[in-house]
From Swiss-Prot:
Motif placement: 'KMSKS' region: 527-531
UniProt motif ('HIGH' region) ranges: 43-53
GO cellular component, one term: cytosol
Protein's name in the database: Valine--tRNA ligase
Claim: Aminoacyl-tRNA synthetase is one of the keywords in the record: yes
Homology family: Belongs to the class-I aminoacyl-tRNA synthetase family. ValS type 2 subfamily.
Domain of life (superkingdom): Archaea
Xref: InterPro entries: aa-tRNA-synth_I_CS, aa-tRNA-synth_Ia, Anticodon_Ia_Val, M/V/L/I-tRNA-synth_anticd-bd, Rossmann-like_a/b/a_fold, tRNAsynth_Ia_anticodon-bd, Val/Leu/Ile-tRNA-synth_edit, Valine-tRNA_ligase_type_2
Free-text comment about domains: ValRS has two distinct active sites: one for aminoacylation and one for editing. The misactivated threonine is translocated from the active site to the editing site.
Transmembrane segments annotated in the record for this chain: none
Phylogenetic classification of the source organism: Archaea, Methanobacteriati, Methanobacteriota, Methanomada group, Methanococci
Source organism of the structure: Methanocaldococcus jannaschii (strain ATCC 43067 / DSM 2661 / JAL-1 / JCM 10045 / NBRC 100440)
Residues reported to bind ATP: 530
Record's catalysed reaction(s): tRNA(Val) + L-valine + ATP = L-valyl-tRNA(Val) + AMP + diphosphate
Length: 878
C-alpha cells in the first residue's frame, strides 16, 4: 500500500467512522481481562464543547487507550448531566416565556427537547476528538432510568436518617430564586464602603459607633457584639441601643469571635448578613427577622424601604442616615462577596424550609475514604480536606426549579405526615402522581414541588455505570471503579458529593484513584471568556490542524496544573505528525507489502547504528510506559525527541546508504530495524495521536494496534551500542554542519577524512561505526587515527586596508601594501603587537584589513572539524 505524499487530516473522519462501525472500544462483559472502569465526568449539555473539555477528555482517552493496550477490559462511558437552571433560562429566552407562563410539565418537555439537541451537538464534537468511548454505555440523567436511581438514593438516605427537612438559613440566589449549597458559592472581590453609623443609647446617654458594609440589613439587626476584653466597651455590655431609622432596641453582647481591630470593634448582628451572623444568632439564641425575601427585595420589616432591591435600598438608607445625622463617615474597602456560581449574582442568606443531607454526620467516614483514594497530584487531596474542615452547614439539596429530578415526597394536610415514595414506585413525579398517607390513609396529599440539586444526580455516576440496582453481581464485582478524572474546580462539589453518596449508600470509596486536571487559559494568560476575545473553540483547531494535533497540545501539560493555550504548540504537534509521516513514507519506499510478514519475524542484528536506535527505543518504551502508568502525559515530549531527532534527523540519514546500496544483507537488516521502530513508535503514539497511528498501522499492516502496548525487549538494551551510536551520530552531525557552512550539498562526496582521538572508547566506537560514518557522509576514504593531528596554521593571504594606507603613505602606498602582503609570521606579529618601523613610516595593525589563514597537516592544506560532544577531531583533506 503506497502512502500519499502529504499527511492529510481528513483521514481522521474516515478512521472515526471505522471505529464507530466496528465498535472496537466496546466493553466486553464476558471478558476475563482485568476491568478498568473510568467514572467519566458528565458535562452539562450546553451544545458547545469548550477547550477545557477537550483537555479533560484527551487526558481520559490517553488513560483509556493506554490501559486497553496494557491488557485491561476498559469501560469508558459517556454521561450527560442534564438538569439545571441554565437550560430553564435558555428555554425561556428561545420561546419568549417564563416558566410560570406555561404548565410545569410542558415547560419540562421544552427543557428536555433543548437538552437532546445540545447532547447531539456535543456528542459529535467528542467523537471528532477521537475519544474511544463505548457509546453503548451512555447515560443521561434526565431519563426515567437515571431518575429512578437518583430518587432511590434519596429514599434510602432518608430512611437512614441522612436526609432531613427543616427551616434553616440557606444560601439563596435572588436571580435564580433557589437555594444553593455552599460549594456552589464563589467569591469575587469588589469595592465597597465601610459605613460608620451612630446607634443611640436607649437611656439617652451617648451613642455607640458601629461599622458595616450592609446598612440595608439594619431592619433585621438583632444585637451588637463586641469582644469581652475590649476596654472601650467592657462597661457597656448588657446595655441597649436603638437601631437608627428603624427604632427597635438591641442589646450589646460580648463574643470572643469579634475582631477588635476591624472598624470600630463593635459589629451589628443581622439575620442574615453572612455565615458569621448565623453562628452568632445560634450561639446567643437571638431572634430571627427576615430582612430580604426570595426575590432579593427588602421585606415589610424595612418599612418604607419594603420592595427595594438590596443595592437600591442601601443607597436610600445611607442617604437617610446622612440626613438624620447618624452617618459619621465612609471608608473605601475591598471585600470578598459570595456570588452564585451560575449567574454571579451576590447571594443572600435567608431562612426557608429546605431538604438537607446531613453531611456533618458523614464527615469522619468521608475523611477516612478520602485517605484510601490515591490523588493525582497528591496535594489536591488537601483541597477536599480543607473543605471538610471548614464545613459547619449541611448540604442543602432542594431547589426551587422545574427541570430536575423530582423529590419523591408528599405532605399530608390532615396529620402532618411527610410521605416518602416506596422504592418500587420509582421513578415518580409527585406533581403528576398522587399518593396515600401511610399514617392516616388520606389520599388528598400536597406534592413536593421542589426538585433535587443536580449534584444529587451526578454524585452517583460511579454506581450507575457499574449497574447499581440493575445487576447486583456486576455491581459487587466492579465497584468501586478504578478512576475518576475531573477538574480541580469541582473537588468540593462533584468529588466531595460523590464520596458522601458512596459512603452513605455503599460504605465504600467510589474509586481507587482520582486524577485532577487544571483550567485552560487563553494565549493572553487569562481565563478564556467572550468578553476578552480570547476564546478558541476545539472545532476551529480541528478544522485547521486535525484532532491529533489538538490532542498533542493537551498531552504536553502537567496533571493538576492550569494550561495556557498556544497556537504555536498546536502547530508544533502538527509539524511533528508531518515529520513522522514523511519518515514513514520514506521507509515505505523500501518496505513493500510482500516483505512485511518476513519483517515481523525476529532477526539477529549486528549493525552498530541499528543496535544504537534499537537500544534507545527500549529506553523510550520503558520511560513512556512508566510515565503513563503515573499519568505523566507530557511524556509525549520524550516521543517527540526520539522520533524527530534520533529517528528522523539521524537514524534515517545514517541508514540511507545501506538502503540504496548493493549489500543485500545490510539492506535487509536496515529494513527490519525501520519496520521494528515504526511498529513500536506507532504503538507509543497511539494513546496520544490515535488517528495518525491507526492510519500508519493500516499501511504497515501493524497488528492489534489498539490492544498491544510495546514491551521492552531486553535483547536490545545495549549500553555500549548507545555510546558508540552517539559518537557516530555526533560525528555525522558535526561534519554535515561543516558541509552546510562551507556551502556544500549535504550529499556531496568527501575525498579523504581522518578522525583523530586520544580517547580509547571513542577510538573503539569510531572504528566500530566507521562504515556507517563513511557511507552516511559519502567519504571515499576514512581513517581513524589514535592520537593528535600535527596541525599547523599558516598565513594564506594578508589583505591591506587601502582606505587607510593611501591617505597616510600617499606615493609610498603601493610599496607599503606589497610589504604587508608578503609579511611572514614574525613580521605580521610585530605589525599587530607593536608596529613595524620602515623607511616609509610605521606600519600598524589598523593598516591590515584581514588575515586569512589555513590549516596544514603534513604539509597539505586541510579543514578541521571539532566533533561536538566527542573527544575527537576530523581532518578533511582537500
Amino acid at each position: 500500500m503506497e502512502m500519499p505524499k502529504d499527511y492529510n487530516i481528513e483521514i481522521e473522519k474516515q478512521i472515526q467512522k471505522k471505529w464507530e462501525e466496528s465498535k472496537i472500544y466496546k466493553f466486553d462483559e464476558e471478558s476475563n481481562k482485568p476491568p478498568y472502569i473510568i467514572d467519566t465526568p458528565p458535562p452539562y449539555p450546553t451544545g458547545r464543547l469548550h477547550l477545557g473539555h477537550a483537555l479533560n477528555w484527551t487526558y481520559m482517552d490517553i488513560i483509556a487507550r493506554y490501559k486497553r493496550m496494557k491488557g485491561f477490559n476498559v469501560l469508558f462511558p459517556q454521561g450527560w448531566d442534564c438538569h439545571g437552571l441554565p437550560t430553564e433560562v435558555k428555554v425561556e429566552e428561545i420561546h419568549g416565556i417564563t416558566k410560570s407562563d406555561v404548565d410545569r410539565h410542558k415547560f419540562r418537555e421544552l427543557c428536555i427537547e433543548l437538552t437532546k439537541e445540545n447532547i447531539e451537538k456535543m456528542r459529535r464534537q467528542i467523537k471528532s476528538l477521537g475519544i474511544s468511548i463505548d457509546w453503548d454505555k451512555e447515560y443521561i440523567t434526565m431519563t426515567p432510568e437515571y431518575i429512578k436511581k437518583s430518587q432511590t438514593a434519596f429514599v434510602r438516605m432518608y430512611k437512614d436518617g441522612l436526609i432531613y427537612r427543616g427551616k434553616f438559613p440557606v444560601n439563596w440566589c435572588p436571580r435564580c430564586q433557589t437555594a444553593i449549597a455552599f460549594a456552589e458559592v464563589e467569591y469575587k472581590e469588589r469595592e465597597s464602603k465601610l459605613n460608620y453609623i451612630k446607634f443611640p443609647a436607649a437611656d439617652g446617654e451617648g451613642h455607640l459607633l458601629i461599622a458595616t458594609t450592609r446598612p440595608e440589613l439594619m431592619a433585621a439587626c438583632v444585637a451588637i457584639l463586641v469582644h469581652p476584653e475590649d476596654e472601650r466597651y467592657k462597661h457597656l455590655i448588657g446595655k441597649e441601643f436603638i437601631v437608627p431609622l428603624f427604632g427597635h432596641k438591641v442589646k450589646l453582647l460580648a463574643d470572643e469571635d469579634v475582631e477588635k481591630e476591624f472598624g470600630t470593634g463593635a459589629v451589628m448582628v443581622c439575620t442574615f448578613g453572612d455565615k458569621t451572623d448565623v453562628l452568632w444568632v445560634n450561639r446567643h439564641k437571638l431572634e430571627i427577622k427576615k430582612a430580604i425575601d426570595e426575590k432579593g427585595e427588602l421585606t415589610e420589616i424595612a418599612g418604607k424601604y419594603k420592595g427595594l432591591k438590596t443595592e437600591e435600598a442601601r443607597e436610600k438608607i445611607i442617604e437617610d442616615l446622612k440626613k438624620e445625622g447618624y452617618l459619621v463617615k465612609q471608608e473605601p474597602i475591598k471585600q470578598n462577596v459570595g456570588v452564585c456560581w451560575r449567574c454571579k449574582t451576590p447571594i443572600e442568606i435567608i431562612v426557608t424550609e429546605q431538604w438537607f443531607v446531613n453531611v456533618r454526620k458523614l464527615i469522619p467516614k468521608v475523611r477516612e475514604v478520602a485517605d484510601e483514594i490515591k490523588w493525582i497530584p497528591e496535594h489536591m487531596k488537601i483541597r477536599l480536606l480543607n473543605w471538610i474542615e471548614d464545613m459547619d452547614w449541611d448540604w442543602v439539596i432542594s431547589r426551587q426549579r422545574i427541570f430536575a429530578t423530582p423529590i419523591p415526597v408528599w405532605y399530608c394536610p390532615k396529620c402532618g405526615n411527610v410521605v416518602v415514595a416506596k422504592e418500587e414506585d420509582l421513578p415518580i413525579d409527585p406533581t403528576k402522581t398522587g399518593y396515600v398517607c401511610d399514617k392516616c390513609g388520606n389520599k388528598d396529599l400536597i406534592p413536593e414541588t421542589d426538585v433535587l440539586d443536580t449534584w444529587m444526580d451526578s454524585s452517583i455516576t460511579p454506581m450507575v455505570i457499574t449497574k447499581w440496582l440493575d445487576d447486583d453481581k456486576f455491581f459487587e464485582k466492579h465497584y468501586p471503579v478504578q478512576l475518576r478524572p475531573q477538574g480541580h474546580d469541582i473537588i468540593r462539589t462533584w468529588a466531595f458529593y460523590t464520596i458522601v453518596k458512596s459512603v452513605a449508600l455503599t460504605g465504600k470509596k467510589p474509586w481507587d484513584e482520582i486524577v485532577i486536571n487544571g483550567m485552560v487559559f487563553g494565549e493572553d494568560g487569562h481565563k478564556m471568556s467572550k468578553s476578552r476575545g480570547n476564546v478558541v473553540e476545539p472545532d476551529e483547531i480541528i478544522a485547521k490542524y486535525g484532532a491529533d494535533a489538538l490532542r498533542l497540545w493537551a498531552s504536553n501539560s502537567v496533571v493538576g496544573d492550569d494550561v495556557q493555550f498556544l497556537w504555536k504548540e498546536v502547530d508544533y504537534g502538527y509539524r511533528f505528525l508531518r515529520k513522522s509521516w514523511n519518515a514513514c513514507r520514506f521507509a515505505k519506499m523500501h518496505i513493500s507489502d510482500d516483505i512485511i510478514d518476513e519483517l515481523k519475524k525476529p532477526m539477529e542484528i549486528s549493525n552498530p547504528i541499528d543496535l544504537w536506535i534499537l537500544s534507545k527505543l527500549q529506553r523510550l518504551i520503558e520511560r513512556v510506559d512508566k510515565d503513563l502508568e503515573n499519568y505523566r502525559f507530557n511524556t509525549i515530549v520524550e516521543i517527540y525527541k526520539f522520533v524527530w531527532h534520533e529517528f528522523c534527523d539521524n537514524y534515517i540519514e545514517m541508514v540511507k546508504y545501506r538502503l540504496y546500496g548493493d549489500d543485500e544483507e545490510a539492506k535487509k537488516e536496515a529494513r527490519w530495524t525501520l519496520y521494528y521502530v515504526i511498529d513500536k513508535v506507532v504503538r507509543l503514539l497511539c494513546p496520544f495521536a490515535p488517528h495518525f497511528s491507526d492510519y500508519i498501522a493500516e499501511i504497515y499492516k501493524i497488528d492489534n494496534l489498539h490492544f498491544s502496548f510495546p514491551e521492552v525487549d531486553n535483547r536490545f538494551i545495549n549500553e555500549e551500542a548507545e555510546k558508540f551510536g552517539e559518537i557516530a551520530k555526533n560525528t555525522v552531525i558535526s561534519i554535515r554542519r561543516f558541509k552546510a557552512n562551507s556551502g556544500m550539498a549535504l550529499n556531496a562526496p568527501l575525498k579523504y577524512v581522518e578522525i583523530y582521538t586520544e580517547d580509547e572508547e571513542t577510538y573503539l566506537a569510531l572504528n566500530k561505526t566507521a562504515e556507517d560514518i563513511k557511507g552516511t557522509l559519502k567519504i571515499e576514504e576514512l581513517k581513524i587515527i589514535k592520537g593528535k593531528p600535527a596541525l599547523e596554521s599558516k598565513i594564506v593571504e594578508i589583505i591591506p586596508d587601502k582606505s587607510k594606507i593611501g591617505p597616510e603613505f600617499k606615493k609610498n602606498a603601493k610599496a607599503v601594501m606589497d610589504l604587508i602582503k608578503n609579511a611572514d609570521e614574525e613580521t605580521l606579529e610585530k605589525i599587530i603587537n607593536e608596529g613595524l618601523e620602515t623607511e616609509y613610516g610605521v606600519i600598524r595593525k589598523e593598516h591590515i584589513k584581514d588575515v586569512k589563514r589555513a590549516l596544514f597537516c603534513e604539509g597539505e592544506e586541510v579543514d578541521s572539524v571539532d566533533i561536538e560532544g566527542v573527544l575527537a577531531m576530523a581532518i578533511i583533506r582537500k
